[in-house]
C-alpha cells in the first residue's frame, strides 16, 4: 500500500474560544488537560559520565546535544524520557519549549504531561512551539523572570482529529530530521576545522623539515614566538549611560553581540547617529576583530568575532576589546583563527580573574605568547581555515532556509488554514 499526503486549503471555519479554526476542529485550554512537574536541584552533580549517573538536562545540552553535567540517581530526581515535553520555567529564556532527552530534569524546568490523553504528544509539542514567542514575552518577575502560570494555563490549542494531528506532527518532524542531518554535517565540519587548527598552529601548512622547542611547544625552525603586544594593541570600548541610548540610530556593539567566531545582533542597543562624529575613535569597521573581555570563554568556546560590511556602522561598548594592528608581520585573518585555537583558549583561561564573572585585563592578555610564521604561510593557513568556514556557512544558510519553510508551513498546518489527509493506494 502506498500512502500519499494530500494538502488542501480549508474554506470552512468557525469561531471557538477566541480562535478561528476549521469546523471539524475543537479548541482546548492548556490548564484543562496539562499538568507539570517541576525539576529539583540535584544532590550530587559531576563533570563526567559515570555509572549510575544521568545527563543533567541543561538548556545547552537540549540545544546542542553535548552533555557537560551528570547527576547521581538517588530516586529523588525527576527522570525525563526521550521526547517528553519540557518547558523552561525560570531564567532569561523562560518560556522556551524543548523535546526531552533521557536524563534528569533541571531545577529551572518543568515536564509537561497530559492528565487525559486527548492529543498526540508530538502535535502538542509543535503547538506549544507555535506559542513560544508569546509565552516568552509574557514572563514576569523583576529579578529572575519566570513563566506566568495563569497566562500559560490559559493558552488555547486548536485540536484537529487525532489522525490529522499525527500527520501534522509527522510533516514537522520530517523538517526537524532534515535540520538535524544538516546540524550533524556542520558538526563534522567543525571537528575537521578543530583538527586542522591544531595541526596548522604547530606544524604549519608548508613542508617544514626541521623543528625547534620553544616556550609554547615544538614549532617549525623558521617560526618566531612573540607576545601579542609586539604585533597588536587592544582598545576597550566606552560606557554609555542608559539615558544616552535611543530607539533608532547607530548600533552599539556590546558583549552580548560577540558570538563564537561571529557577530550577532539578536538584541540591539542604539546610540544617536551623531555619536559617529562625537566618538570617531570608537567607530568599528569591517574587518575589525573584537573579543569579549568579561566572560571571554563560555561553554569551552571563545567569544570573538570579526566584523563584516553588514555590521557597519557600530560603536564599541565597554569591556569589548578591539585589536589594533601595529605590525605588518601578522595577517589579520591568521590572528582571528589563532585567537579561536585550543592553544590560545588554554592560555587565556589561565589568566582569567574571578569565578562568577571571570574577566581578563588587557595588559595581561597582551603578554600571551603566540607562534608567528612568515606572512606568506600565515595567509595560506588562514585560507585553508576560511575554506572550511565557507562550507560551514553554506550549510548554515541551507539550514536557515529549511527553518524558514518549516516555520511557514507550521503556522498554516497548526491553524488549519492548510489541511492534510492521507490518500491510500
Curated annotation (Swiss-Prot):
The lineage of its organism: Archaea, Methanobacteriati, Methanobacteriota, Methanomada group, Methanococci. Contains two DNA recognition domains, each specifying recognition of one of the two defined components of the target sequence. It comes from the Archaea. It comes from Methanocaldococcus jannaschii (strain ATCC 43067 / DSM 2661 / JAL-1 / JCM 10045 / NBRC 100440). The type I restriction/modification system is composed of three polypeptides R, M and S. This is Type I restriction enzyme MjaVIII specificity subunit. The keyword DNA-binding applies. Belongs to the type-I restriction system S methylase family. The keyword Acyltransferase does not apply. GO terms for molecular function: DNA binding. GO terms for biological process: DNA restriction-modification system. Keywords: DNA-binding, Restriction system. Type I restriction and modification enzymes are complex, multifunctional systems which require ATP, S-adenosyl methionine and Mg(2+) as cofactors and, in addition to their endonucleolytic and methylase activities, are potent DNA-dependent ATPases. The specificity (S) subunit of a type I restriction enzyme; this subunit dictates DNA sequence specificity. In the presence of the R subunit the complex can also act as an endonuclease, binding to the same target sequence but cutting the DNA some distance from this site. Whether the DNA is cut or modified depends on the methylation state of the target sequence. When the target site is unmodified, the DNA is cut.
Amino acid at each position: 500500500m502506498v500512502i500519499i499526503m494530500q494538502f488542501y486549503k480549508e474554506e470552512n471555519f468557525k469561531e471557538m474560544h477566541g480562535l478561528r479554526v476549521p469546523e471539524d476542529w475543537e479548541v482546548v485550554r492548556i490548564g484543562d488537560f496539562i499538568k507539570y512537574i517541576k525539576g529539583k536541584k540535584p544532590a550530587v552533580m559531576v563533570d563526567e559520565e559515570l555509572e549510575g549517573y544521568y545527563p543533567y538536562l541543561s538548556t545547552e545540552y537540549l540545544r546542542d546535544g553535548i552533555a557537560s553535567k551528570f547527576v547521581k540517581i538517588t530516586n529523588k530526581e525527576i527522570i525525563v524520557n526521550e521526547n517528553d515535553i519540557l518547558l523552561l520555567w525560570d531564567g532569561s529564556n523562560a518560556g522556551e519549549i524543548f523535546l526531552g532527552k533521557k536524563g534528569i530534569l533541571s531545577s529551572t524546568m518543568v515536564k509537561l504531561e497530559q492528565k487525559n490523553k486527548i492529543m498526540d504528544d508530538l502535535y502538542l509539542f509543535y503547538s506549544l512551539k507555535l506559542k513560544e514567542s508569546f509565552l516568552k514575552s509574557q514572563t514576569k518577575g523583576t529579578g529572575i523572570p519566570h513563566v506566568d502560570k495563569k497566562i500559560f494555563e490559559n493558552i488555547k490549542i486548536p485540536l484537529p482529529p487525532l489522525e490529522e494531528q499525527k500527520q501534522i506532527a509527522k510533516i514537522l518532524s520530517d523538517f526537524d530530521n532534515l535540520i538535524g542531518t544538516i546540524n550533524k554535517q556542520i558538526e563534522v565540519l567543525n571537528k575537521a576545522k578543530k583538527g586542522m587548527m591544531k595541526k596548522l598552529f604547530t606544524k604549519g601548512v608548508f613542508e617544514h623539515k626541521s623543528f625547534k622547542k620553544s616556550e609554547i611547544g615544538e614549532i617549525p625552525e623558521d617560526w618566531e614566538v612573540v607576545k601579542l603586544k609586539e604585533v597588536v594593541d587592544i582598545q576597550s570600548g566606552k560606557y554609555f549611560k542608559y539615558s544616552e541610548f535611543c530607539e533608532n540610530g547607530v548600533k552599539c556593539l556590546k558583549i552580548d553581540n560577540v558570538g563564537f567566531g561571529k557577530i550577532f545582533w539578536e538584541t540591539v542597543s542604539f546610540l544617536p547617529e551623531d555619536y559617529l562624529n562625537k566618538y570617531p575613535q570608537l567607530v568599528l569597521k569591517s574587518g575589525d576583530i573584537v573579543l569579549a573581555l568579561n566572560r571571554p570563554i563560555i561553554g569551552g568556546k571563545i567569544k570573538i568575532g570579526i566584523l563584516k560590511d553588514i555590521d557597519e556602522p557600530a560603536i564599541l561598548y565597554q569591556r569589548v576589546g578591539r585589536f589594533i594592528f601595529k605590525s605588518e608581520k601578522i595577517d589579520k585573518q591568521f590572528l582571528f583563527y589563532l585567537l579561536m585555537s585550543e592553544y590560545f583558549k588554554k592560555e587565556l583561561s589561565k589568566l582569567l580573574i574571578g569565578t562568577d564573572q571571570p574577566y581578563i585585563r588587557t595588559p595581561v592578555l597582551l603578554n600571551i605568547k603566540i607562534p608567528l610564521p612568515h606572512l606568506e604561510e600565515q595567509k595560506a593557513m588562514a585560507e585553508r581555515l576560511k575554506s572550511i568556514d565557507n562550507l560551514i556557512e553554506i550549510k548554515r544558510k541551507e539550514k536557515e532556509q529549511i527553518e524558514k519553510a518549516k516555520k511557514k508551513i507550521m503556522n498554516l498546518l497548526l491553524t488549519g488554514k492548510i489541511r492534510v489527509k492521507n490518500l491510500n493506494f
